[in-house]
């Protein structure tokens, strides 16, 4: 519990500096939507956005007609940015303040989206906890989309070391239950004008 609180405090402090100034900021979730489109995720599907925080993805999905959208983030402060941006529409989103490593899903989701959470898990124990949560929250046929730093991406982010992956390396980490079905690369431009290369993959759960 103490570790969860420390992590939450870290990310709350990060968001307190202003979302639009942070390296992860994006005005529109273009690559996320591109990957979801590429693998046939539609408005009829349920979707959970891991580490969604202040991301504009939830709003973009609502605009496309999605009606079963969940955002999970360890930082309540981060999600407040998205809530304020959405205004009354925020009530159409399920907001969960939790650490994905200790969260216990109570349902299945058709689509799992993670932009820049998994690459913070540099310990194998934490990756295994994450993958257990992923498996619990999905069933055969589900889609998982990941965006993580590429091999030539940053070695640290928000003061912490990160893992970097090629598409094949990232798919191997997710495991043999999941089949790699799409991949892409993004050159994310931060508010400071620097470039952060991202690896993107989409997988389908086989069993």
Region spans (language model):
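Short catalytic micro-motifs in class I SAM-dependent methyltransferases
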Residues: 116-120
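Class I (Rossmann-like) S-adenosyl-L-methionine-dependent methyltransferase catalytic domain
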Residues: 1-107, 121-137, 143-207
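A conserved beta-strand element that flanks and buttresses the S-adenosyl-L-methionine
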Residues: 113
